[in-house]
Amino acid sequence: MKTKKEAVIFDWAGTTVDYGCFAPVQAFSEVFKEAGIVPTMEEVREPMGMLKWDHIHTMLNMPRIKEEWKKKYGKEPGKEEADQLYARFEPALLKILNQYSDPKPYVLETVEKLREMGIKIGSTTGYTDLMMEIVAPAAKELGYAPDCWFSPDSTGGMGRPYPYMVFKNMEALKISSTGKVMKVGDTVSDILEGKNAGMFTIGILEGSSVMGLSLEEYESLSQEEQEKQREQAKK
């Protein structure tokens, strides 16, 4: 017997706002370039969805980046280097976040339909509270306002793939079982968050960080090319 869903928990950037998830990509690329390391788009996007410090630490441990860092600085990067890059990353991201808070196409209509069905809207994010204090009000002005949001700050820094932000949502929304909740996101860590919480999980393809195209780039493609991009994103 299927359990009726009572809530949907969405991710933010790349899922409900910021088509293509470009705000963090821009900031990550900028701070690594400032440090003399030019990351590829694949390297920048692979850890997307994690807590941002964890994202930087993961990038520093990628074989090519680690080797480039060792050549430039004479030692392998560690926690100290991640701290230094994050100290530059946060202000770089905060400076541009309000430009990347527009709801993606069909998000407002989807949320409206879900609420008509009596379904509550929760959300989790890899952003910090400070970042969300910019994104959430900007998105609300444009019509998107979930019933609640939780960042890794609410769980002692235990962000994705840990499921604890999801459980915070369930508590706030007064949902008694993970079987009554659906998790939606656009990154591998989003999917793992939902799976680790033991709930039905959906991956977004169009406008996702994994696909990495702007709305204009995607809409300029033929239907065949769009389908090819969607299939590639599934891999």
Where are these regions (language model features)?
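Asp-based, Mg2+/Mn2+-dependent phosphohydrolase catalytic module
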Residues: 1-6, 108-113, 128-235
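N-terminal helical cap/lid subdomain that shapes the substrate entry/recognition surface
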Residues: 3-108, 112-117, 133
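Residue-level detector of anion-binding/catalytic polar loops
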Residues: 38, 120, 200
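Conserved residues at beta->alpha junctions
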Residues: 47, 123-126, 185
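Glycine- and other small-residue-rich loops at beta-strand/loop junctions that grip anionic moieties
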Residues: 100, 124, 158
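Short active-site oxyanion
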Residues: 119-122, 179-181
